[in-house]
Amino acid sequence: MKRELLLEKIEEYKSLMPWFVLEYYQSKLSVPYSFTTLYEYLKEYKRFFNWLIDSGISDADDIASIHIKTLENLTKKDMESFVLYLRERPSLNTYSKKQGVSQTTINRTLSALSSLYKYLTEEVEGPDGEPYFYRNVMKKISTKKKKETLAARAENIKQKLFLGDETMKFLDYVENEYEVKLSNRAKSSFYKNKERDLAIIALLLSSGVRLSEAVNLDLKDINLKRMVIDVTRKGGQRDSVNMASFARPYLENYLSIRNKRYKAEKQDVALFLTEYRGVPNRIDASSIEKMVAKYSQDFKIRVTPHKLRHTLATRLYDATKSQVLVSHQLGHASTQVTDLYTHIVNDEQKNALDNL
């Protein structure tokens, strides 16, 4: 979703919310939570508050009128009834006969509610310096995680990674082969953004940064001489991230045409730009997701920018066998998250089995 539309939707949801959710929203902006995360959370709150009214737990006439005492007094049984409602309610998708929402959606809903309850019971300070209330019913509600071993998850992800020489083959395909099947009209659009698209893909594949980190890069954040970018990690921490040298020519090509192609002026500080009717803007996450999906599907298999992050992490682990190094590259505080890559790179285990 484009940033302008996203902010418009956020304002629409905010206009429906009770005062304590608006306080929560303002607080999380300072963390900072991304607008995308806050948008998803507001959607979940609307769903939950509508249920409170429809089920008779709240006698409010509308969402904005829901009293904070209603949240304080919710019982474990109430929350379990809400989860059951999510599991069994008719699907809103007219093309599906499946009842209820997925476990992933339920987990996201519970995560959003846990965040709100933590704010209300621990983080906020009322006039007396204390939280609004102390009873956090969400601590009694557990989420059901998908049962899947790391090995099974790794095998599933592995099919969607561009490992070995496929990293460079993918870039070469976008640069030299993708355009062959395009119409003249499609070629015109492709040529306009070719250098930029290649630079973005190369940056993701060479650094493993998150999509949001790439989107928020400014010109001042990139040092091609040292092949380093400065990014804002989750939680607002600044970090310097190394890039593999294969990305340099793609980034140099883009920077050489950036100002003229996208009509960039001094005030246009964003690294990656899009241009519409002569006005340059920072490219948004949705545009990059669509771009990566388009090229990757034509090359081999449709993937997301996050799979390009997995690609870099897997290749780096394969080359170094160091989970610490990989976790530092990805911006993780713990090596636990990188356990996945040890299972993707499991040739030694397979070779041992072959020798039995």
From Swiss-Prot:
Known regulation of its activity is: FtsK is required for recombination.
List the Gene Ontology MF annotations in alphabetical order: DNA binding; tyrosine-based site-specific recombinase activity
Stretches assigned to the Tyr recombinase domain? 169-354
Is the keyword Cell cycle assigned to this protein? yes
InterPro entries per record: CB, DNA_brk_join_enz, Integrase-like_cat_sf, Integrase_catalytic, Integrase_recombinase_N, Integrase_SAM-like_N, Recomb_XerS, Tyrosine_recombinase_XerCD
Provide a GO CC annotation, any one.
cytoplasm
By sequence similarity, the record places it as follows:
Belongs to the 'phage' integrase family. XerS subfamily.
The protein depicted here goes by the name: Tyrosine recombinase XerS
Question: What is the scientific name of the source organism?
Answer: Streptococcus thermophilus (strain CNRZ 1066)
